[in-house]
Amino acid sequence: MPALRQTPCVAAALVLLLAALAAAAAEEDTVKRGEYLVRAGGCCSCHTAPGGQKLAGGRALKTPFGTFYSPNITPDPKTGIGRWTDAQFQRALRQGVSPEGTNYFPVFPYPSFTRITDSDALAIKVYLFSLPAVHQENRPHDVAFPFSWRLLQTGWKLLFFSPGPFEPKPDRSAVYNRGAYLVTALAHCGECHTPRNLLGATRSGQQLAGTPDGPDGELVPNITPDPATGIGKWDKEDVVEFLRTGMTPEQSRVKGAMREVVEDGLKYLSEDDLEAITDYLLAQPAIVRSVTRRK
């Protein structure tokens, strides 16, 4: 009889064990998915200083408005994001607002990240919180007045920020919409490949047309399908190969920031996602715009 009385206890213990194993497996899957999304988003390229620890920040980004330094996004509770709640993380990513309620400068690409889905945003957070915490103080930005005035960002948002999730086009294929999500939200390609106005907002009607004023003063090429000034002479295989390896059809290897984007992120993406990005890019309006260094 004692053995019979123990049977329900054993069964309950097995149920709890199986539930715990299932939860652990689900957590591991979320971490892996979050790592993939971080790769796609190019987070390591911006949030890791040369010779520094992964995602601990401190990388300088020179712009026409001054020099910005990326923050520590490891789970350190004092100098990183270790105390952030899910809601605070999503608000930062998708609204450009810190846990303290201040606006981030749009050098942080929240105008694109606003389109990221809830599930992707939380998977990114789960992955970041699985990493070792690095105690490294954030370096203050070196930005001239009036651009250094945080309150000015409120007006900037009213003029140029359109918050809201990604909305797939019902008349387009699933592949196109996946590519649109990757390009316009997660990988935020337009943040570097689109020219900006005097206030630092991307120019409407010039999406992906390139700019001579890229990060650190780099020339950022036109990636619309214009055959003369963009990638219009590239076929689908050319684009996929470039995204995977950084090699152009002319057999020259990409340099600068884009090399890091490929090495730290794009080369890890699935073939399906690389093809989706390609499908979207080649379906965009061709814009005639030669990108040359300013004299």
Predicted regions and their residues:
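Electrostatic cytochrome c docking/interface patches
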Residues: 21-39, 78, 155-184
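N-terminal secretory signal peptides that target proteins for export/translocation
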Residues: 1-6
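Electron-transfer interface patches adjacent to heme c in soluble/periplasmic c-type cytochromes
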Residues: 62-91, 111-121, 207-250, 260-274
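Detector for the c-type heme attachment site
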Residues: 46-52, 94-95, 129-130, 192-198, ...
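Bacterial N-terminal signal peptides
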Residues: 10-20
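Extended, well-folded interaction surfaces typified by the phenylalanyl-tRNA synthetase beta subunit core
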Residues: 136-154, 293
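The canonical Cys-X-X-Cys-His
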Residues: 34, 40-50, 89, 124, ...
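Membrane-embedded segments
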Residues: 87, 96, 101-105, 109-112, ...
